Amino acid sequence: MTGGKSGGKASGSKNAQSRSSKAGLAFPVGRVHRLLRKGNYAQRVGAGAPVYLAAVLEYLAAEILELAGNAARDNKKTRIIPRHLQLAIRNDEELNKLLGHVTIAQGGVLPNIHQNLLPKKTPKAKGSQEL
């Protein structure tokens, strides 16, 4: 075969390592880079931008999943359902601000009864009213 095409990997890629593993991330840096290029956000995309964005997305996912796991444990469940995600996001001030206009399917609403709808508390007299 001429031209150096042996059908295998390139000679310099014996220790190939993904950009995600180089950055210590679980989210795919290569896929984020491809989506940034295809999304027409800018003409050019720097090398550090997809790494940073993947790290931010991974952090947000971990934060939401931790709070949702706590909500599931509070409800004595071992599986996170959309209701737990909804409770986690709406009870956290910053996440609620970030995802304020997001609708979560099968998420339900936060339990809340307006103060005016609650029964009035009657003060009890210390002395007995009976004769």
Curated annotation (Swiss-Prot):
Record-annotated disulphide pairs: none
Keyword annotations: Acetylation, Chromosome, DNA damage, DNA repair, DNA-binding, Methylation, Nucleosome core, Nucleus, Phosphoprotein
GO biological process, one term: DNA repair
Keyword Phosphoprotein set for record: yes
Region feature (Disordered): 1-24
Keyword DNA damage annotated: yes
CDD domains reported in the protein's UniProt record: HFD_H2A
Composition bias, Gly residues: 1-10
Post-translational note: Phosphorylated to form H2AS128ph (gamma-H2A) in response to DNA double-strand breaks (DSBs) generated by exogenous genotoxic agents and by stalled replication forks. Phosphorylation is dependent on the DNA damage checkpoint kinases mec1/ATR and tel1/ATM, spreads on either side of a detected DSB site and may mark the surrounding chromatin for recruitment of proteins required for DNA damage signaling and repair. Gamma-H2A is removed from the DNA prior to the strand invasion-primer extension step of the repair process and subsequently dephosphorylated.
Residue positions where N5-methylglutamine is found in the record: Q106
InterPro entries reported in the protein's UniProt record: Histone-fold, Histone_H2A, Histone_H2A/H2B/H3, Histone_H2A_C, Histone_H2A_CS
PTM sites of type N6-acetyllysine: K5, K9
Renumbered ranges of motif [ST]-Q motif: 128-129
Coiled-coil annotated residue ranges, if any: none
A cellular component annotation (GO) from this entry: nucleosome
Function summary: Core component of nucleosome which plays a central role in DNA double strand break (DSB) repair. Nucleosomes wrap and compact DNA into chromatin, limiting DNA accessibility to the cellular machineries which require DNA as a template. Histones thereby play a central role in transcription regulation, DNA repair, DNA replication and chromosomal stability. DNA accessibility is regulated via a complex set of post-translational modifications of histones, also called histone code, and nucleosome remodeling.
Oligomer and partners: The nucleosome is a histone octamer containing two molecules each of H2A, H2B, H3 and H4 assembled in one H3-H4 heterotetramer and two H2A-H2B heterodimers. The octamer wraps approximately 147 bp of DNA.
Designated name of the protein: Histone H2A
Organism classification: Eukaryota, Fungi, Dikarya, Ascomycota, Pezizomycotina
Gene: hta1
